[in-house]
Amino acid sequence: KMIDMGCDVVLATDFNPGSCTIQSMPLIISLACLYCGLTIEEAFIAATWNGARALNQENIVGAVSTGYQADLLFWDLNSINEIPYWMSSNRILNVMKKGELLEKEF
């Protein structure tokens, strides 16, 4: 309903030991789709662009575009629509942070 009313919804882990020990954004995206009724597209916008805007970082992160910091996840999926169905599995193949591929420690 909030999205239909034009509100910008943000998804985040808000990791806080003791009250919220979830660190997995794929899990948060899955929960938003399965229990809150967001489409996968709405969940991705909420987890990326809207999150960047909420932190006043929309000129740096939150989109894949020229001039943006390249923070990317590479997934083992045929479509982003599969994410809610893999919520308990790590389907991430690789991570890029600021344009550099990270060593596979995830």
Where are these regions (language model features)?
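His/Asp/Glu-enriched, well-ordered alpha-helical/loop segment
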Residues: K1-W75
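C-terminal cap of metal-dependent C-N hydrolases
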Residues: W49, Q69-F106
